[in-house]
């Protein structure tokens, strides 16, 4: 099981580096508990982040899951500060710019990749396109997700 987690971690680190992000996190969607749990984090400044769970129907994370498309946190939009303070990851990590990308395995959403920056520098279309290609490649590795799902079954429910 560690093989799958290590491979996914390697890909998340690669996407963080290629998009010049300060933070990258992979939240896994658990249909049984109806929560997203942040199990893989890179560049975290908060010890709370790996233990956080979120409802997959709320906020920017929920919009990405429901729409199946990337959702950007744009600090210049009206209501942006409220969106930021209502999202525990954006708040805990001090992210000023972020993009939430759904990770699909087949026809199911397995999780969400969050890329973020602590300085206000919006993601370009090219960076988002690169991240989308990366999430598609992650989702295509079905054996990784099977191993990770088996491991997640033993995780505590929150």
Give the positions of each predicted feature.
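Signal-transducing coupling segments at domain and membrane junctions
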Residues: 76-95
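Amphipathic alpha-helical coiled-coil segments that mediate homodimerization
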Residues: 3-26
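Short hydrophobic/aromatic beta-strand element in the GNAT-like acyltransferase core
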Residues: 23-25, 87, 100, 112
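GAF sensory/regulatory domain recognition
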Residues: 26-48
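A short, aliphatic-rich beta-strand micro-motif
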Residues: 97-104
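Regulatory sensory and allosteric helical modules in signal-transduction proteins
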Residues: 45-81
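Juxtadomain coupling helices with adjacent low-complexity linkers
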Residues: 5, 117-158
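Sensory beta-strand/linker motifs that couple input domains to effectors
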Residues: 107-117
């Amino acid at each position: 099981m560690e093989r799958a987690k290590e491979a996914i971690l390697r890909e998340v680190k690669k996407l963080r580096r290629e998009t010049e992000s300060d933070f990258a996190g992979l939240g896994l969607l658990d249909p049984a508990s109806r929560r997203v749990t942040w199990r893989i984090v890179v560049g975290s400044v908060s010890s709370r982040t790996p233990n956080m769970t979120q409802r997959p129907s709320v906020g920017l994370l929920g919009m990405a899951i429901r729409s199946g498309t990337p959702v950007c946190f744009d600090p210049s939009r009206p209501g942006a500060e409220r969106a930021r303070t209502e999202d525990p990851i954006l708040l805990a990590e001090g992210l000023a710019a972020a993009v939430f990308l759904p990770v699909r395995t087949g026809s199911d959403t397995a999780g969400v990749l969050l890329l973020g920056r602590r300085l206000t520098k919006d993601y370009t279309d090219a960076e988002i396109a690169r991240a989308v290609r990366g999430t598609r490649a992650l989702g295509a590795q079905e054996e990784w997700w099977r191993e990770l799902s088996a491991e997640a079954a033993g995780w505590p429910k929150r």
